[in-house]
Amino acid sequence: MFIINLLLYIIPILLAVAFLTLVERKALGYMQFRKGPNIVGPYGLLQPIADAVKLFTKEPLRPLTSSISMFIIAPILALTLAFTIWTPLPMPHSLIDLNLGLLFILALSGLSVYSILWSGWASNTKYALMGALRAVAQTISYEVTLAIILLSIMLINGSFTLKNLIITQENMWLIMTTWPLTMMWYISTLAETNRAPFDLTEGESELVSGFNVEYAAGPFAMFFLAEYANIMAMNAMTTILFLGSSINHNFTHLNTLSFVIKTALLTFMFLWVRASYPRFRYDQLMYLLWKNFLPLTLAFCLWFISIPVALSCIPPQI
């Protein structure tokens, strides 16, 4: 039974990730006045399956100078963490109901840094290492703001449990009262997942492909799946934190449909941003965080600490 539950949990994520790549290519295509994939199957719908078959049937090559064990472990770790981050998310029921769900997700997103660092270091090439160092600095930096925003949400919510957030937002979505935090959270998730306009880790013009430049076939596909699973997980988190993932506790199917639609719209915005904005310069990326986001999030955090003290009330505040 446990194996069946695990498969029912993993397979939908894999299918969603596979077709997200197709939606991205189609969306970017139409935004650039071209068709996108349209040969494999009707309207190109079988393109993700063709890509998967191609990648997993190729021979996985590696540099002679690479560190074998770490080179293989890095993509497996990336994919495992990308799947594990989904377990505490209430959709509307979670696979594991954790009291410290918010902390668990923050810890896992911090662990994903190791897969990037190991892949860059184990490749033993300068471009991969430079890409990995960039990615690690960027990810660790933006986790600071994500942690402070989560602390502010926790102060409003009154606990670290994700299910409590649904109860907090029964009357009003948190985006209504904390819209500056929502904007900063969304931009930080773009940087955290290494997406455009913050995709400096891939920097094609100077780093070829970034930390995964030496990967091919199956291991490369694992990194690819992990990246898109993380994107969807982050958007699912945004939905739970700010967009009130539940409508009516009596209709769980309606709640799930609402959750999926909101997450899909947020994910489409990721693709829209990629099509619209040019890449940031690295110093601009760091200045945005340390000179703009950090002071603002700290100020908002102090504000949310002072409200219960000033009004002598206990959370949830909404």
From Swiss-Prot:
GO terms for molecular function: NADH dehydrogenase (ubiquinone) activity. GO terms for biological process: aerobic respiration. Disulfide bonds: none annotated. The keyword Transferase does not apply. Keywords: Electron transport, Membrane, Mitochondrion, Mitochondrion inner membrane, NAD, Respiratory chain, Translocase, Transmembrane, Transmembrane helix, Transport, Ubiquinone. The chain crosses the membrane at residues 2-22, 68-88, 100-120, 136-156, 172-192, 223-243, 253-273, 294-314. The keyword Translocase applies. Signal peptide: none annotated. Its main location: mitochondrion. It comes from the Eukaryota. PANTHER family: NADH DEHYDROGENASE SUBUNIT 1, NADH-UBIQUINONE OXIDOREDUCTASE CHAIN 1. This is NADH-ubiquinone oxidoreductase chain 1. It comes from Trichosurus vulpecula (Brush-tailed possum).
